[in-house]
C-alpha cells in the first residue's frame, strides 16, 4: 500500500497532481479542496494517498490531510459508493461539513453533491453516521508546502486543551476554525485556546 507520496510537483489540474518521486512520476487524483492547496509546480509537496485497486481499476488518490483520506476511504465502504462519488463529496464540502450533515441527517445538503440523489443520501446517513461520529476532522487549510508544521501543532494542542476544559470536540473544532478565519497568523496554542474560549462564550 502506498501511504503517501512526497516529491516535486511536476503538473497539476483541478482533479489531479503529477508528483516526481526520485524519478518516478505518480499521477494522483485529488479533490478540489486539495487542488486549491497545492504549491506551484517545481515545489515540494506531500500527499496522503489511498491506493484503490480493483480488477478493472487501479488508481491513486491523494489528499491534503489524513482526515480527508479517512473520509474518502470510509465513503467507498458504503454500498454503491465508488471513489468518483467520494471524491466529488470532498470537492463539494470539507470533512467537517460532510460529517455534520451526515450526523444531522441533512439530506438537502448531501444531495447538493454531484451524483448524490435522495436514496444515496439516505444510504450515506445510515451507513456513515456511526463511522464518522468520532472522527477527528479538524482541518488545516494552510498551503501544502512549508510553514504549516507549527500551525498544525498549535491546532492539535489547542483542540486537546479545549476538550480537557470541558468543550465537546465539535464545539472546540468550531471555535478554533472561527478564530483562525479571523486570525490566520496565530501559531501559539495558548493564544488559540484563549481566543477560542472567548469565541465559544459569544
UniProtKB/Swiss-Prot annotation:
Keywords recorded for this protein, A-Z: Cytoplasm, DNA damage, DNA recombination, DNA repair, DNA-binding
Keyword DNA repair: yes
SMART domains, A to Z: HhH1 (SM00278)
SUPFAM superfamilies, sorted: DNA helicase RuvA subunit, C-terminal domain (SSF46929), Nucleic acid-binding proteins (SSF50249), RuvA domain 2-like (SSF47781)
GO biological process, one term: DNA recombination
Major localization listed first in the record, in broad terms: cytoplasm
Positions of region (Domain III): 150-202
Recorded GO MF terms: ATP binding; four-way junction DNA binding; four-way junction helicase activity
Name the UniProt record assigns to this protein: Holliday junction branch migration complex subunit RuvA
Amino acid at each position: 500500500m502506498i501511504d503517501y507520496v512526497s516529491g516535486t510537483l511536476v503538473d497539476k489540474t483541478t482533479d489531479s497532481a503529477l508528483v516526481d518521486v526520485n524519478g518516478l512520476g505518480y499521477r494522483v487524483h485529488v479533490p478540489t479542496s486539495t487542488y486549491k492547496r497545492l504549491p506551484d509546480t517545481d515545489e515540494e509537496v506531500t500527499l496522503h494517498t489511498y491506493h484503490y485497486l480493483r480488477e478493472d481499476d487501479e488508481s491513486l488518490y491523494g489528499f491534503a490531510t489524513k482526515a480527508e483520506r479517512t473520509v474518502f476511504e470510509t465513503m467507498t465502504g458504503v454500498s454503491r459508493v465508488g471513489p468518483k462519488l467520494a471524491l466529488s463529496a470532498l470537492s463539494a464540502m470539507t470533512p467537517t461539513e460532510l460529517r455534520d450533515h451526515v450526523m444531522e441527517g441533512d439530506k438537502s445538503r448531501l444531495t447538493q453533491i454531484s451524483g448524490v440523489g435522495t436514496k444515496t443520501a439516505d444510504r450515506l446517513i445510515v451507513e456513515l453516521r456511526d463511522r464518522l461520529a468520532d472522527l477527528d476532522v479538524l482541518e488545516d487549510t494552510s498551503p501544502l508546502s512549508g510553514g504549516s508544521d507549527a500551525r498544525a501543532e498549535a491546532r492539535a494542542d489547542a483542540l486537546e486543551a479545549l476538550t480537557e476544559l470541558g468543550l465537546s470536540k465539535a464545539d472546540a473544532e468550531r471555535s478554533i476554525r472561527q478564530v483562525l478565519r479571523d486570525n490566520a497568523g496565530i501559531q501559539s496554542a495558548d493564544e488559540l485556546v484563549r481566543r477560542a474560549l472567548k469565541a465559544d462564550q459569544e
